[in-house]
């Protein structure tokens, strides 16, 4: 009941999963938000995540500024947000906006707020209201040309809204990509470490809101959002192409990032058609295709003192709102992969990590904190069975056995901090 960001939210698909799901949800909620109350609600199988930006002042005025589609996500955490949402009828869009305003007025809310909803088969359901600006408020700013932060300050100072509902005009299309320190080829495992180089993209219609610079350390103890890449263009197709160009220009070295995943997602036919749902990334796609395309690009490669050989490359550039392909002679160095459309996932899989190399050792795939040990010496385990739960960067990761056998040794306890490669347990 308390919190957000996907924490304390568990899907239960049958009676035998209720106890474990409840225990995990309440443990996360208590750890992150200090409250462990939980509630049960209907689970929608293929919804889209649509949210409405609202504003209300102390003078009785309330408006909605359009919707954002946040359906491209993993672990209930958003990867891509865009406005307007593709495929929504004007009738549904207006109904959602008016419902969001009623929510704000019904509870006497003032200032900026985000009413989140789930949409499926022509119907929508209230999910929650975030009483603040969202990370993705930037896309609404770009399509409405309204400074929402400045408006928030004015309303907090007791001033009335500077615009009414009829003054809100939405133009063009905006897309935001959340660039996270994660390895998409390993189930979006967190990738803490030092950023050795960060170069932000530029050009018309491109905005970079970053929290790190070259040389900064990304800690395991905090959220792994490196920055937000936001683009605007007159229509959705141009916005997607502009986002792809900016992602190729963005350089983040020293850690794994979601840049290759974003390129694959933006280029996928499902995203282009707007048929994706909140389950799309985790259940329908096989992002391990990025490995063959160079999924670890962005992690700084070793270099020597010898000068790089020059090779001829075709580089996309944008000048005065127009895109060109320019042939250039550049150093023969690794570049971020184009990562074409991701392949269909052969079957749904859970977001979890495996430890060890099949020799019976269970190792930590990343730096983190052990939150729960699921086995004891003498227990029999199967291949793929969860052995421990490791928390890193606000995410719980189940560490699975890669070999069947009997647990001979458990070397850690709940609360222990471990590093990548540390042996957690031994299976014989």
Provide a role label for each language-model segment.
Residues 214-216, 312, 415, 421:
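Glycine-centered loop/turn motifs
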Residues 284-329:
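Long, low-complexity segments enriched in small/aliphatic residues
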Residues 348-428:
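Structured functional modules or segments
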Residues 62, 160, 323-325, 386, ...:
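Short, solvent-exposed loop/turn motifs
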Residues 1-5, 11-302, 343-347, 352:
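ATP-dependent carboxylate activation and anion-phosphoryl transfer catalytic cores
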Residues 330-345:
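Short, surface-exposed, low-complexity cationic segments
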Residues 6-7, 224-228, 312, 325, ...:
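Short, solvent-exposed beta-strand edge segments and adjacent coil->beta transition regions
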